[in-house]
Amino acid sequence: MINKFFFKYTALFLLIILSYTVFLKAESISSYNQDNSSIKKLYETWHKAVESSNIDGYINSLDKNITLIPPGGPIISGAENYREFLGPVFESATYKIQDGEYDIEVIGDIAIVRSRQTVYLTFKDNANKIQSDGALQDNITTSDYLDVLKRQEDGSWKCLVHTWQLVPIK
């Protein structure tokens, strides 16, 4: 009798644990999908801002403590310093972005995003150089980007660290 009682409640306990584990896994998958979707939306609006030379829209994609680490240029810290960097960038050229796949890894309130993107630059008004050190200078540039994103208090994502490595032309 005790054996039957013990077996019955042990099986019930294991069933409850298993159900709870499945529930947590489903919740985790849902959260992962929601984060991925939000992050991809961030890049969509960020790229629209670049392609329309919208500095405010661009800055809206960045955490206030953004760090830009451009290859061949100085490290830029803070959204207002980044805004100053963008002035000559958008005054001198227009841009079109062809983005590749995003490799997104979310770790709590931080996300690491890797992607390969090609940027098409068209100089304006006889310009032939962007005056901001570290800005892209070639008409076509393919780069491997590495961004660190931070979840904001409202649950949205913004870029905390932005850097890239140029992909050599073969």
Where are these regions (language model features)?
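A beta-strand edge to alpha-helix "cap/lid" segment located at domain peripheries
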Residues: 26-60, 67-170
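Bacterial N-terminal signal peptides that target proteins for export
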Residues: 2-11
